[in-house]
Amino acid sequence: MMEDNKQLALRIDGAVQSASQEVTNLRAELTATNRRLAELSGGGGGPGSGPGAATSASAAAVTVADSAVATMENHQHGAQVLLREEVVQLQEEVHLLRQMKEMLAKDLEESQGGKCSEVLSATELRVQLVQKEQELARAKEALQAMKADRKRLKGEKTDLVSQMQQLYATLESREEQLRDFIRNYEQHRKESEDAVKALAKEKDLLEREKWELRRQAKEATDHAAALRSQLDLKDNRMKELEAELAMAKQSLATLTKDVPKRHSLAMPGETVLNGNQEWVVQADLPLTAAIRQSQQTLYHSHPPHPADRQVRVSPCHSRQPSVISDASAAEGDRSSTPSDINSPRHRTHSLCNGDSPGPVQKSLHNPIVQSLEDLEDQKRKKKKEKMGFGSISRVFARGKQRKSLDPGLFDDSDSQCSPTRHSLSLSEGEEQMDRLQHVELVRTTPMSHWKAGTVQAWLEVVMAMPMYVKACAENVKSGKVLLSLSDEDLELGLGVCSSLHRRKLRLAIEDYRDAEAGRSLSKAADLDHHWVAKAWLNDIGLSQYSQAFQNHLVDGRMLNSLMKRDLEKHLNVSKKFHQVSILLGIELLYQVNFSREALQERRARCETQNTDPVVWTNQRVLKWVRDIDLKEYADNLTNSGVHGAVLVLEPTFNAEAMATALGIPSGKHILRRHLAEEMSTIFHPSNSTGIRESERFGTPPGRASSITRAGREDSGGNSKHRAGRLPLGKIGRGFSSKEPDFHDDYGSLENEDCGDEDLQGRPEQCRLEGYGSLEVTNV
């Protein structure tokens, strides 16, 4: 806009200057014309020619003046837009004046030549001259008016320039303010970004602290649960010891008074034919320490019965034949673990296997009583309260005719001094022996031959389910009825509401059914729920779930049927990695055919050497981590579920996953590389091939190893074994991401069809399901 105003002002100035020049030129021409007219009039030209020329010149001058005045007037009333047109008009008038000048010049020439016919008089010339002078005066006034307009325009121009300068100044100030605002905004934005980053860092720190507190709370909860489970286990152990003490005292009373009857029970049982199968009493199970001591004290002076050294083989328990002797029995006592003592077979058979009876040595009675008194004194020191007899009555009462124990058995005085107490102890001993005979029939007689008492003894003692004995006594009268029971019958007839308890009974019944069909009882039957809850869960590093497994009575057969949904729904194993750890631990048991002896033998061989890592326990993995100079991180694997089967059988559990489980920071690349090198030397896939395909610890007939059976079907007709365990697929694409967040997508355990011919009645909800976002934790 300022540029347009400047250009307009320049054009106006140029037009005014050109008009001034034209007016000056016109004045000069008029002066020259007047002078020539005066010369003509003074020179005495013709009387007719002089006035005529003067008149024409005056007329021309008047015309020019009139036109100039008109032009000036138009210029005064015109606007700035009409200035250009006025300049053009002035130029045209100048052109006309020039033409008139030429005409006047021609007239002068004609007048000089005497061609003019008429000459104005001097008076007329004077009149015309006066008129011209007036016209000139008007022209001067017009010029002055034009000059005044020019001055006014210049003033307006100056005002416009000053206004433009003010606008420029205002604009510059606004621009400066805008720059200041932008500068302040940028600074404020940077400060806001810094504050947001600081808040984000603080938030991350608080999140880490929150998760750390949660982890610590979880650890504290797990530790409290583990302590609570240990306390419960100790209480249960105390009750079992009390029961065993009562059994020992009553057995002692029975042995001292009824040795011939004890001798008859120790003899090999008669054979029972069932088709081509022969059921023989197996006497290779160890006795409890107290009873073994009493028997050795009573019978040490007599030679063993010849039948004790014969080889006894039972189709129900297809074990390696063993020669029973006093030395081997003593060695069995020394090598037995607390879990072995607590097993159903040990508890139920400990009173049935002894040396050959002989005459009672009365002189040896006092040391036996003294040893029992020492045991009772130790028990009283641990628990100074009156011992309850509920568990003992449940174990040794028969049916609905339950009798109280003789209180004289727990007296420190000599039990032989009173005839009444002696007779009561004999009757109680007979009931105990009757119950033990029923338990003995459980392992020596097919289930279809069982009577009602044998079924009740099996349910109460072997299966550890005394809560269902009453309903069983009312509804189940024989083993054939037990074999024909369905899951609905178990729930309605026996009141078994727990699905896991029903499955435990179903698996046991099917196992005995297979034993009658010609196969032996599975070795998983030797793994009772005490061993699973105490020893096995501790070996795989998940002892925090011991109480749940104990409550649901999970034994070896149950382990072989557990699936992901069972772990999550019934056993409260919610973490995916813990579920995988348990399933891989079961897979290892499956590879060794659920042989506890074979597993312990392999673990003993690799205790001091870094070999056979597939059988490593969680404690052995911790020892290996300490041996490779990572002891500051070893404690993070406690109760983490990391054991040898996870390290070997799961190919996606690599060094990154192990480092994450150990809690090694991602920035410590040297430690992670060191761990990867150590793992590659121990857990290389080629090192475990022989372990997984070990011929020494083969799989049951009709089942291939879970590592090599992929893509093959079992055509041998063993539907139970074919559907008993589902193969484990890839658990995930990786365990090492913790950017949980450590939250990559992981794969899943493969689902396979359980088979329509599954005799174990595997429930639909127990089938293996997929795992999503599997996560390794060090909690």
UniProtKB/Swiss-Prot annotation:
Residues 415-426 have a biased composition (Polar residues). Residues 295-366, 403-429, 685-779 are annotated as: Disordered. GO terms for cellular component: cornified envelope; cytoskeleton; cytosol; desmosome; nuclear speck. One of its GO terms (biological process) is keratinization. It is found in: Cell junction; Nucleus; Cytoplasm, Cytoskeleton. Pfam families: SAM_1, SAM_2. Residues 79-261 form a coiled coil. Residues 736-746 have a biased composition (Basic and acidic residues). Residues 450-515, 528-592, 616-683 form the SAM domain. The modification Phosphoserine is found at S356, S371, S391. Expressed in skin interfollicular epidermis and hair follicles. Expressed in tongue epithelium basal suprabasal layers. InterPro entries: Kazrin, Kazrin_SAM_rpt_1, Kazrin_SAM_rpt_2, Kazrin_SAM_rpt_3, SAM, SAM/pointed_sf. Keywords: Cell junction, Coiled coil, Cytoplasm, Cytoskeleton, Keratinization, Nucleus, Phosphoprotein, Repeat. Belongs to the kazrin family. Component of the cornified envelope of keratinocytes. May be involved in the interplay between adherens junctions and desmosomes. The function in the nucleus is not known. PANTHER family: KAZRIN, KAZRIN-RELATED. This is Kazrin. It comes from Mus musculus. The lineage of its organism: Eukaryota, Metazoa, Chordata, Craniata, Vertebrata.
